Amino acid sequence: MNKILAAWAWNGPVSEPIAYGEGHINQMYALTEQATQKRYILQKINTDTFKDPDGLMENICGVTDFLREKAKQRGADPERATLHVALTKAGKPYYKAADGGCWRVYDFVENTVCLQQVQSSEDFYQSAVAFGNFQHQLADYPANTLHETIPHFHDTPKRFADFQRAVAEDRMGRAAQVQREIEFVRAREADYHVMVDLLTAGKLPLRVTHNDTKLNNILFDKTTGEGLCVIDLDTVMPGLAANDFGDSIRFGANHCAEDESDLSKVNFSMELFEIYTKGFLQAAGEAFTPLEKQTLPWGAKLMTMECGMRFLADYLEGDHYFHINYETQNLNRARTQFKLTADMEKSWDVMQKIIEKYC
């Protein structure tokens, strides 16, 4: 570890790195400069997931530099408005160790907290404002210059093709027992092309998207409760704004566990949908085209279906991607997503009216 730390020009000795945070993808540590008491985050990039660390860090540096300039222009604190990458002595955004491990350092954003679950509707609203502001501030960033850090990440037609292959191969002999779920996915095949076709036709613009818009990817100000800074930028890529909106809705607009086995407890919350829509569009609305706003419900439905079919495909393939604690966990996860989708379909007109209300 000392050889790794020596790649940065610290202001004197630093403390021993201590494991920090609850992330599952990258190893993360906190450390402190002893002379200044300034804290930093040291992360090892998971190059199994992110195979192009150069492209990954080029994305992150480009976007965070841009966000800092925007913060200065509006009179906000640029060091709290976004992450700040500490460059190595060689002027690089990460260090490649002798064993091939790739490490990076961020300034620690003080007086902030990361929430793992929605504790109040205000938390969900503040997360919407934070992600909406992320879209607003990056509206004029050239999205086509970003690297695709995980190819086809939110390519729903490709996810469906992968699902179909998992069903056909049926490696674990489980398909016969989940025909109802398989047919639920197949019955919505036409839906999976809606957003991609609009993008291909030039009717929807390519945006800078976060692609993992969960509550725990925001730093909240401990004093004010404000959603301050969007973090975990590894999946920042070109994409559709509706997908970022939709992933938040999928994750947050319900009160159930992700693997709830009692589907009577799984309900899509229109109240939380409206709270999030209000915050998201208040922060980002003027940056979006009318059609982008109209298609936000499609983002919610497609991100939920995409996640559900990925859970079901993993169940059919032997649970090799998503970690499980019991045999049917991925199946329960899939059923939960499908129940949320069915609820959205029943409330489609109401969802559209809520979008119109805040346009």
Description of each model-found segment:
Residues 242-286, 302-321:
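Active-site activation/catalytic loop segments of kinase-like enzymes and analogous catalytic loops
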Residues 202, 216-257:
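Catalytic activation segment of kinase domains across protein kinase-like and atypical kinase folds
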Residues 18-22, 43-44, 50-54, 109-125, ...:
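ATP-dependent phospho-/nucleotidyl transfer catalytic cores
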Residues 17-20, 24-162, 239-241, 252, ...:
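Conserved ATP-binding subdomain of kinase catalytic cores across diverse folds
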Residues 1-17:
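Juxta-kinase regulatory segment immediately upstream of eukaryotic protein kinase catalytic domains
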Residues 288-300:
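All-alpha amphipathic helical-bundle segments outside canonical DNA-binding/catalytic cores
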Residues 344-347:
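Long, compositionally biased intrinsically disordered regions
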